[in-house]
Amino acid sequence: MSPSAFLRALRPHQWTKNVFVLAALAFAAGEKGEAFSTEAAVATLLAFLAFCLTSSAVYLLNDLVDVEKDRLHPKKKHRPIASGALSIPAARLGMVLVGVGGLALGWAAAPGGGVAGVLVLYATLNLAYSFRLKHVVLVDAFCIATGFLFRVEAGGRAAGVEISHWAYLCMLFLALFLALNKRRAEVMQLGEGVATTRQSLREYSIAFVDQLVGVEQGHIMEYQNFNK
C-alpha cells in the first residue's frame, strides 16, 4: 500500500466539512451565556476527529463502488483507486481500519455511545447513498445535507448541549444550498459527458439547479429575518 496514495484517498481536504461538529461549542456558549468548558471542548474535538475518520471511510467506500464510472470521469479518473495507485484490497482494508478508528474516537468523545451512534447512522445513510440513493435526483442532495445535520448532532452530544429545531433548519438550508451548488458545478464540468457518469446527474440541468438554489437562498434569508 502506497502511504501517499492512501492518504489522498482519505481526502483530508474534505475534512473541513466536519467543522459543523464544532458548531455545537458556539451553541453551548450561547445557551449557557458563558465560555464552554474544557471538557466540552475536548469531547467535541474528539467528535470532530471521529467524523474525519468516518467520513474518510465513507469516501473509500464510495470510490470502491464507483471505481469503473470514475475511470470515465475527466477528473475522478485520477483518484487513487480509479487510477490504480491504490489497490482495491488495500482500499477495503483501509476502509475498515479507518472506520473502526472513527467509532473508537466517537465512543471516547461520549462514552455513553451518543456520538458513536450518530456515526453509525451517518455510515448507514452513506451506505444506502453509495449503492442506491445517489442515483435518485434531489434525494442525493438531501442525503448530503443530512450528513451535515449528523455532524451538528454529534457535536451537540459531545458538548452536552441540545441543538434547537431552528438551528437544525438553518443548517439544513445551508447544507442543501451547498449540495445543490456542488451538483451545478458537476453538471457544468461534465457538459455532454454527464450521460456517462452518475444517473441522477442526467436529471439535473443548470436552469433546474438555479431554480432550486434560488429557493434555498430565500429560505436562508427568511430564517435570518426571523431571528433578527
Residue spans for each PLM region:
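Structural signal for the C-terminal ends of transmembrane alpha-helices
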Residues: 27-32, 128-132, 181
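Acidic (Asp/Glu-rich) catalytic motifs at the cytosolic membrane interface
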Residues: 54-80, 139, 180-188
